[in-house]
């Protein structure tokens, strides 16, 4: 059963412009890997920029942030890996 409501959670940005959707969130909201999701990201502690893009989750629960969105989010001196993200997932 695909996602029908907004899901908000906090996670850490990993290396390779990815973040992990926890098993609990995937189980509770019955997230499927074949569903296209509208992802909204806010990086805590850098800029208060809001980035929105469409994505699919991989089998292991990771979502890759597009390179265009990453360049808009990050400052040239700051590497964002390890920063905390506020994530909102909603059906597309």
Say what each PLM segment does:
Residues 10-13, 53-58:
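Short, acidic Ser/Thr/Gly-rich low-complexity loop/linker segments typical of extracellular
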Residues 15-29, 58-74:
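Short beta-strand-centered segments at strand-helix junctions
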Residues 30-46, 73-92:
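A short beta-strand-loop micro-motif that forms or neighbors metal/cofactor-
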């Amino acid at each position: 059963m695909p996602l029908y409501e907004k899901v908000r959670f906090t996670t850490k940005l990993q290396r390779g412009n990815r973040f992990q959707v926890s098993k609990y969130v995937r189980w509770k909201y019955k997230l499927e890997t074949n569903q296209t999701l509208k992802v909204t990201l806010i990086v805590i502690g850098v800029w208060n920029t809001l980035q929105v893009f469409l994505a699919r989750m991989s089998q292991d629960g990771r979502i890759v942030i597009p390179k265009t969105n990453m360049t808009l989010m990050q400052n040239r001196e700051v590497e964002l890996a390890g920063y905390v993200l506020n994530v909102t997932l909603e059906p597309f």
